[in-house]
C-alpha cells in the first residue's frame, strides 16, 4: 500500500514541481511585473525605505492584529527555514553553480508576485469572530472574486491543512533533532543508542513550546517571531559573511562560475551537469520553494498587519523575497562555492554540504553554532506554519476549530522527533505545490486590482485606498 502511495505521489509531485508549474509561476510573475511597471525594480530603493525604516519604529497594533514588522517577521519565520541551508546545497549539487543565477532570476520575478499577494491579502482582510484580523488567498478569493470562484478558497485551505503537519511541523522537528544529535555526537555527550530517548524528550519539550506560543494567540506569535527571526538571520548572515571574507580571493572566480554555469554548466562541473535546462530547473524551483512566492502562504501572516495601506505592506513582500533568496540563499551558495569543499556534482546533497563549508573554514567548533542556526530556522518555520494552518482550518470550519487544531499540531512534534519521515516529507511537498494552483488563478484574475491599488498609492504617496469601492469594483470587473 505504501509503495502505491509513494508511486502516485511521485507522479503528482514531478508534475506540480515540474516544468508546467514553473512556467505558470514565472509567467504570472512576468505578467504582474509588466502590469506594475516592474515595481520591484523601479521602486526597490523606496521598498527598502518603507520596510527597513518602519522596522526601527516602535508601535502597537490593535487587538487581534500584528504590527507591520511583526507580520513580516512571522512570514519570514515560515519562509526562512532549513531549505535555505539544505535546499541551496541540493540545487548546486544537481544543477551546478549556474543554478544560483536562475535562483536570482526567480527571486526577481517572485518579488512582484509576493508583493501582489501581500497587497491583495491586506486589501481583502477582515475580522473573524474572535476579533482577529484574518486574510490570505482564501479571503482574497472570497472577497475579491465572484461566487463561482469561491471553491478555489476551500481548495487552497484544504491543501494548506494537509501541508502544515508535514512541511511545517514534523519534518522541521526531525531537522532539529538531527542537528542537535549531530552536534552532541561530536562531543560524546550522547551515544547513538540513547538518541531515541533523547529525541523523544526533545519532541515533548517542543510540543509544549509550540502549544504555549500558538494558544497564546496572534499577539504572542508576533512577540516571539519579532525576536527570533532577527536573531537567527543576523547570526547566520554573520557566520556566512565570515566565510566569504576569509575566502575573499575566491569570490571573483565563484561569480564567474555562477554566470558561466548558468548557460554552460558542463564547462564548470567537468561534464557532471551537462544540461542547461537542469541548471535552470533546479535554480528556479529552489528559488520558488525557498521564498514561497506563488504559494500565497506568506500573505496569510501579512494579512494580520494593522494597516490601512495594502500597497505599503506589499513592499514588505519585496523585502521578504530579497532577504530570503538574494541575501540568505546567496550567502549559503557562497559558503559552499568559495570555501573549497568538494561538491559531488550530479549527486544529491543537503545541509551537510553547507555545514562542511563552515567547518572547513572555521573548524569543528562551529558545528554548535550551525546546529543552533538550524534549530532556530526549523522552530521559526513551525510557528509560522502553525499560524497558516490555523487560518486554513478556521476558514473551513470556523474559529471553534482553532484550539483543537493547535493542540493536534503541537503533538505532531513528538511524531516528527521519533520517526523516519521520508514519505511524509514528499507528500507534504506535493500538497505544498498544490496550493500554488488556486492561488495563482486568483492572483492572475485580481491583477487588475493590484494595478489599481498601486496607481492610487503612488499617486497619493501613501494615501489609503477606499476599501469598499475597490472591493465592489473588483467583483463587477473580474469575472
Predicted features along the sequence, with ranges:
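Alpha-helical membrane segments and immediately flanking helix-loop junctions
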Residues: 59-94, 120-143, 155-161, 273-322
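Membrane-interface loop-to-helix entry segments
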Residues: 24-31, 35-48, 173-180, 197-247, ...
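Extracellular/periplasmic helix-exit of transmembrane alpha-helices
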Residues: 115-125, 129, 241-257, 265-271, ...
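Helix-loop-helix module between adjacent transmembrane segments
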Residues: 31-33, 106-131, 138, 142-174, ...
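Flexible loop linkers connecting adjacent transmembrane helices
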Residues: 38-66, 90-100, 104, 112-147, ...
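Membrane-interface alpha-helices at helix entry/exit sites of multi-pass transporters
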Residues: 59-65, 96-105, 143-155, 188-197, ...
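N-terminal alpha-helical transmembrane segments of multi-pass membrane transport
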Residues: 1-82, 92-99, 110, 245, ...
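Transmembrane helix-loop junctions in multi-pass membrane proteins
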Residues: 4-5, 35-40, 83-88, 166-176, ...
Amino acid at each position: 500500500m505504501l509503495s502505491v502511495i509513494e508511486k502516485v505521489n511521485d507522479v503528482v509531485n514531478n508534475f506540480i514541481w515540474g516544468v508546467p508549474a514553473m512556467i505558470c509561476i514565472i509567467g504570472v510573475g512576468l505578467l504582474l511585473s509588466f502590469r506594475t511597471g516592474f515595481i520591484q525594480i523601479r521602486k526597490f530603493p523606496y521598498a527598502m525605505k518603507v520596510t527597513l525604516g518602519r522596522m526601527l519604529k516602535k508601535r502597537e497594533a490593535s487587538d487581534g492584529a500584528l504590527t507591520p514588522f511583526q507580520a513580516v517577521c512571522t512570514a519570514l519565520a515560515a519562509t526562512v527555514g532549513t531549505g535555505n541551508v539544505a535546499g541551496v546545497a541540493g540545487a548546486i549539487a544537481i544543477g551546478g553553480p549556474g543554478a544560483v543565477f536562475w535562483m536570482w532570476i526567480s527571486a526577481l520575478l517572485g518579488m512582484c508576485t509576493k508583493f501582489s499577494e501581500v497587497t491583495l491579502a491586506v486589501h481583502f482582510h477582515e475580522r473573524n469572530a474572535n476579533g482577529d484580523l484574518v486574510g490570505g488567498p482564501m479571503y482574497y478569493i472570497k472577497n475579491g472574486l465572484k461566487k463561482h470562484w469561491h471553491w478555489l478558497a476551500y481548495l487552497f485551505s484544504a491543501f494548506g491543512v494537509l501541508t502544515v503537519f508535514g512541511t511545517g511541523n514534523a519534518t522541521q522537528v526531525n531537522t532539529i533533532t538531527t542537528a542537535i544529535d549531530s552536534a552532541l555526537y561530536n562531543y560524546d555527550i550522547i551515544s547513538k543508542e540513547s538518541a531515541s530517548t533523547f529525541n523523544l524528550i526533545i519532541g515533548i519539550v517542543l510540543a509544549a513550546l509550540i502549544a504555549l506560543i500558538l494558544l497564546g494567540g496572534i499577539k504572542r506569535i508576533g512577540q516571539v517571531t519579532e525576536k527570533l527571526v532577527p536573531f537567527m538571520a543576523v547570526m547566520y548572515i554573520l557566520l556566512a559573511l565570515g566565510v566569504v571574507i576569509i575566502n575573499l580571493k575566491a569570490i571573483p572566480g565563484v561569480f564567474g562560475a555562477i554566470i558561466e554555469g548558468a548557460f554552460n554548466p558542463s564547462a564548470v562541473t567537468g561534464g557532471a551537469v551537462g544540461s542547461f535546462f537542469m541548471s535552470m530547473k533546479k535554480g528556479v524551483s529552489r528559488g520558488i520553494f525557498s521564498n514561497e512566492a506563488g504559494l500565497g502562504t506568506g500573505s496569510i501572516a501579512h494579512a494580520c498587519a494593522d494597516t490601512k495601506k495594502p500597497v505599503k505592506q506589499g513592499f514588505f513582500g519585496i523585502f521578504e523575497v530579497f532577504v530570503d533568496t538574494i541575501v540568505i540563499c546567496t550567502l549559503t551558495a557562497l559558503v559552499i562555492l568559495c570555501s573549497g569543499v568538494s561538491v559531488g556534482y550530479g549527486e544529491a546533497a543537503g545541509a551537510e554540504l553547507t555545514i562542511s563549508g563552515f567547518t572547513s573554514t572555521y573548524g569543528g567548533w562551529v558545528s554548535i553554532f550551525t546546529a543552533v542556526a538550524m534549530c532556530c530556522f526549523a522552530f521559526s518555520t513551525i510557528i509560522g506554519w502553525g499560524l497558516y494552518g490555523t487560518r486554513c482550518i478556521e476558514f473551513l470550519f470556523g474559529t471553534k476549530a482553532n484550539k483543537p487544531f493547535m493542540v493536534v499540531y503541537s503533538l505532531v512534534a513528538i511524531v516528527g522527533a521519533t520517526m523516519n519521515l521520508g514519505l511524509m516529507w514528499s507528500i507534504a511537498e506535493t500538497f505544498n505545490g498544490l496550493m500554488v494552483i488556486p492561488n495563482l488563478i486568483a492572483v492572475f484574475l485580481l491583477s487588475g486590482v493590484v494595478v489599481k491599488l498601486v496607481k492610487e498609492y503612488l499617486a497619493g504617496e501613501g494615501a489609503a485606498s477606499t476599501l469598499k469601492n475597490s472591493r465592489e469594483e473588483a467583483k463587477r470587473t473580474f469575472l
